[in-house]
Structures are given as structure tokens and as C-alpha cells.
Amino acid sequence: MNPLNTQWFYWAFHKQLRAELGRQKADVVWREAGQEYTRILTTAPAMKRHNGAMALPAVALYRTLTSRGENAEALLNAYGDRMGRRFAGIVHGITSIPGVSRLIWRHVAGIMDRMSGENLGYRRRIVSEPPDLYGVDILSCPYHELAKALGNEKAVLCICHMDKAYMKGFRHIRYERTTAVSEGAECCDYRLRFDRNRK
């Protein structure tokens, strides 16, 4: 069985590849990327438990697509955008339930702390000014660091694209990022503000 089939975030990428490259070519790419993913983990089994392990399928797909002359970065980033829009719809549905956005805002400092904690492999700088602004500068991210160590840091941009797209789904919360470490910036500058007019 192709190990990529067990990676929930990447399941739909196979379907997108079929639409972009044709069924036969996409199936070959998917199979070879699965083999590359297995090779990466065989070479360094500890990577499976790395905080940035979600980037490994992207690295395998990036390498395979590039070796076949495809624009791996564009294909993966388009997929990240698509998944981000899908997640944004889910987030919007949840935060449209009366009281949910205020509940999230009440606990936003703790949520932010857990989602970008150093125990998850992040280096960060808190820049919050409560109660109006909660923010964190991510100075290094485990996904980017792992992809960079494997020599394919651009592979992780699809996760950044997903992230930026899904952030638009919050109702009553403006969740923004204008820079990203993976794009060469000093940090990923996450900023959250409560906005009751945001629909």
C-alpha cells in the first residue's frame, strides 16, 4: 500500500494531480512519491516522530514532481490554497455558532500558546497587547526546519499557503499573517484581533 494514502492532509492531492497531469502520469507520480517517502523514513526512521513530520510527504512529492520536470512548487502551493479554503469554510461554520467566536477569543492566549509552543518545535516571540491584540512571531517552524534539512525547503510552502487561506475563515476574529520564514522573512507574524463586524 502507498504510505501517502495514510497521510490525511495529502489525500486529495492525488485527485488534483490526475486533473492536472492526467490519470496515468499522476498515478506514476503518486506511486514514486510514496516510494520516496518510504526511502526518507527508512534512511532516518526518527523523522516519523519529528514535530515537522507533516512536511515529509510534501518533500517526497516535491522531489518526485521536480524529477519529472513538473512545477512542483506551483502544484503543491495550489493544493495548499485549496485545502486552506476548505478548512476556512469549516472554521467559519464553527465560529458562526453563537458565542463560539467570543469563547475562542476569551481563551486565545492559551490556544496560541499551545499551538506554537516550544514543545512542538517552534521558536517564537510573543508580541501580544491584550485585550485588543494577540500576536506571536514564529522565528523558526519545525516544518520548515525539517524540509530545509532535507534540502527541499520550498516543499513546505504548501503548508504555509494552507495556513494563510484557512485564517480567513474566522468569524469576528481577524487572523492575519503578512510574512513567513519559509519565504525568507525573519518571522511568521501572526496577529489576531477581535472584530465584531467581521462576518
Predicted regions located by residue number:
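N-terminal, charged low-complexity regulatory/assembly segments
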Residues: M1-R63
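Short flexible/disordered coil segments
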Residues: N2-P3, F9-Y10, M54-R68, E145, ...
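Charge-dense, low-complexity intrinsically disordered segments
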Residues: L4, K48, G99-R102, L150, ...
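Residue-level preference for well-ordered alpha-helical positions
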Residues: R18, T66, M167-K168
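Generic structural motif
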Residues: V28, Y122-R125, Y175
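Amphipathic interaction/junction segments at domain boundaries or subunit interfaces
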Residues: A53, P57-V59, R63-L150
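C-terminal non-catalytic interaction appendages of large macromolecular assemblies
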Residues: D132-G135, P142-K199
